[in-house]
């Protein structure tokens, strides 16, 4: 019975060693480069923001223009 347990322990140790040993020679991954932003993306973001502001102002001002008495659709 003792030899059976020792064989099981040796088999378990061999299995764990076989699974872990390939990772011993593995190289660590290189760190990812830090994200950088260039001026073009910042300019594009500002342009989109200004376009949204212009669109909102257009929709806010247009109903005031349409409600005047001199405005006709045809």
Curated annotation (Swiss-Prot):
Residues modified as 4-hydroxyproline: 31, 33, 35
Prodomain residues: 38-74
Compartmental location: Cell membrane
GO CC annotations on file: plasma membrane; side of membrane
Glycosylation sites: 31, 33, 35
Family: Belongs to the AG-peptide AGP family.
Protein's name in the database: Arabinogalactan protein 20
